[in-house]
């Protein structure tokens, strides 16, 4: 299951992670975000040993989304070795996201 990450825990959970990290930036009021949630949960289970999957509520945590230029949600961002590798904006299908993750880790 995808865990939550906050502005305060981001450095430890994401930038210092030994595994690549997928961060789903979302908000309660965002319908496409709610549609993406079950897909993110499935990816979290399917790729558990390869990728850490985290979710960040942008309304509760405005600092990190601002730092990384999040302007639309849902946005998923992939980090590896403490660096941002790639970003996808909008609602995507599970297979498309898994292929994208595998190509970037």
Swiss-Prot record:
UniProt cross-references to Gene3D superfamilies, sorted A to Z: Glutaredoxin
Disulfide topology: 30-33
Keywords tagged on the record: Disulfide bond, Electron transport, Redox-active center, Transport
PROSITE patterns: THIOREDOXIN_2
UniProt xrefs under Pfam families: Thioredoxin
InterPro entries: Thioredoxin, Thioredoxin-like_sf, Thioredoxin_domain
GO-annotated molecular function: protein-disulfide reductase activity
Keyword Isomerase: no
Keyword Heme: no
Domain of life: Bacteria
GO CC aspect terms: cytoplasm
Limits of the Thioredoxin domain: 1-105
Biological role: Component of the thioredoxin-thioredoxin reductase system. Participates in various redox reactions through the reversible oxidation of its active center dithiol to a disulfide and catalyzes dithiol-disulfide exchange reactions.
Record family assignment: Belongs to the thioredoxin family.
Protein's name in the database: Thioredoxin
